Amino acid sequence: MSDNDTIVAQATPPGRGGVGILRISGFKAREVAETVLGKLPKPRYADYLPFKDADGSVLDQGIALWFPGPNSFTGEDVLELQGHGGPVILDLLLKRILTIPGLRIARPGEFSERAFLNDKLDLAQAEAIADLIDASSEQAARSALNSLQGAFSARVNHLVEALTHLRIYVEAAIDFPDEEIDFLSDGKIEAQLNDVIADLDAVRAEARQGSLLREGMKVVIAGRPNAGKSSLLNALAGREAAIVTDIAGTTRDVLREHIHIDGMPLHIIDTAGLREASDEVERIGIERAWQEIEQADRVLFMVDGTTTDAVDPAEIWPEFIARLPAKLPITVVRNKADITGETLGMSEVNGHALIRLSARTGEGVDVLRNHLKQSMGFDTNMEGGFLARRRHLQALEQAAEHLQQGKAQLLGAWAGELLAEELRLAQQNLSEITGEFTSDDLLGRIFSSFCIGK
């Protein structure tokens, strides 16, 4: 298998459909056109032609599109054949194309990978293709499209350019120490560095929003049996996703629901009631519940309001609170307000949010929805956002750390050489986002998660 091979893959989903598309990219795409179509179509014009088998018989007829490189998606010669979407027809056409020597089936994401390697897309834009396909809400789709059109890359490239100018200034000060003006201590470098740090902080804030849109927030509902956890899951999901009975221990396994709150994806997880297990099945369910809790972004601690008047989680169930991971955010949810007569709404107890509601009637659930949105700092009014992946957040965080360390070197010891090195490392971190500085292993992991025809 060579990266110089001509590749072919189905670009439409498998199964039956009105249209099925095969995409070919590489230097032999021209030969495929001449062999299967009998002619080379006019570049970038739709040509209605028969698709022929090796014996000259017609396999199908449809639209052929010819994009000679470098003016194509991949930067190579690209041919697209748009025929009928029957799986048998597409399979016959694919087999016909593969009889031509030098062609092979594309690896997942190989078309996008070639576009990246041929400088048609940077890495952040290439990732945005997969994110656009996988978008689970309108806002996520719009943000992914912004990334594909270069919004995220432009912000990163602006930071890289600012760091480049700052590095030139710092290294000039190091190389010419005998000048009358001390460039390191005259305040200009500190001012420029502060500007870059402020710009980076703004990009990090937008990237966290983008990561929320892409990754979502994992919220685990936990508590004792019969506290109303499954009822709350159903209320948040807007459907009967979980079985609800008065029998303690009805939920034995983990239940998952994917919902959206004003465009923000939430992974809501209902768990088995936590207690001493009465049998092996319940024990496994409780074990899985704790595994989910340990991986959660937030825990909704469900409390049956008819069993206690306490509101402090450490007073309600100290053993449960003690076992939770450090710094895991907790929201105390006092359920069954329709029975206790408690006032619906939200307050705060010892640093924890407290919400009183009725999962059965749905009263107060909107307060919880708004709280979940606010707790992650999600801004639905932010325009022109972009999607961000975990690796993007890590690169931005590392760049910010290097800039802060560089600032400390500048202000603490006027150490120009150490500042220059921190600036170089920050620039390297940012360049990893767009792929200007990226390992082959990382590229392999990214593109292997794509669709075959992308």
UniProtKB/Swiss-Prot annotation:
Optimum pH is 7.5-9.5. Keywords: Cytoplasm, GTP-binding, Hydrolase, Magnesium, Metal-binding, Nucleotide-binding, Potassium, tRNA processing. It is an enzyme of class 3 (hydrolase). Mg(2+) binds at residues 230, 251. The keyword Cell membrane does not apply. One of its GO terms (biological process) is response to pH. GTP binds at residues 226-231, 245-251, 270-273, 335-338, 358-360. This is tRNA modification GTPase MnmE. It comes from Escherichia coli (strain K12). The lineage of its organism: Bacteria, Pseudomonadati, Pseudomonadota, Gammaproteobacteria, Enterobacterales. The gene is mnmE.
